[in-house]
Amino acid sequence: MSGNTGERSFADIITSIRYWVIHSITIPSLFIAGWLFVSTGLAYDVFGSPRPNEYFTESRQGIPLITGRFDSLEQLNEFSRSF
């Protein structure tokens, strides 16, 4: 025999007007806040990722690709100096 926890059923919740009044405001506002977070560039600043125009600088236009098998440490040091 199962007991009653006193909680409302899911169907009862999503058919109530109160649910839709609350969520018709919060869901679009979360979408707009996320869009503004990304479109203003604040996401780049918060997470520290480079902006699309900062991947390649004027001095370094090539891809930092390690080609040597035995001198890879020297190439890594060279790449890290260019940053």
From Swiss-Prot:
The chain crosses the membrane at residues 21-35. It comes from the Eukaryota. The keyword Iron applies. Coiled coil: none annotated. The keyword Transmembrane applies. Its main location: plastid. It is a single-pass membrane protein. Its cofactor is heme b. InterPro entries: PSII_cyt_b559_asu, PSII_cyt_b559_asu_sf, PSII_cyt_b559_CS, PSII_cyt_b559_N, PSII_cytb559_asu_lum. Heme binds at H23. Keywords: Electron transport, Heme, Iron, Membrane, Metal-binding, Photosynthesis, Photosystem II, Plastid, Transmembrane, Transmembrane helix, Transport. PANTHER family: CYTOCHROME B559 SUBUNIT BETA-RELATED. Heterodimer of an alpha subunit and a beta subunit. PSII is composed of 1 copy each of membrane proteins PsbA, PsbB, PsbC, PsbD, PsbE, PsbF, PsbH, PsbI, PsbJ, PsbK, PsbL, PsbM, PsbT, PsbX, PsbY, PsbZ, Psb30/Ycf12, at least 3 peripheral proteins of the oxygen-evolving complex and a large number of cofactors. It forms dimeric complexes. Belongs to the PsbE/PsbF family. NCBIfam families: cyt_b559_alpha. This is Cytochrome b559 subunit alpha. It comes from Cuscuta reflexa (Southern Asian dodder). The lineage of its organism: Eukaryota, Viridiplantae, Streptophyta, Embryophyta, Tracheophyta.
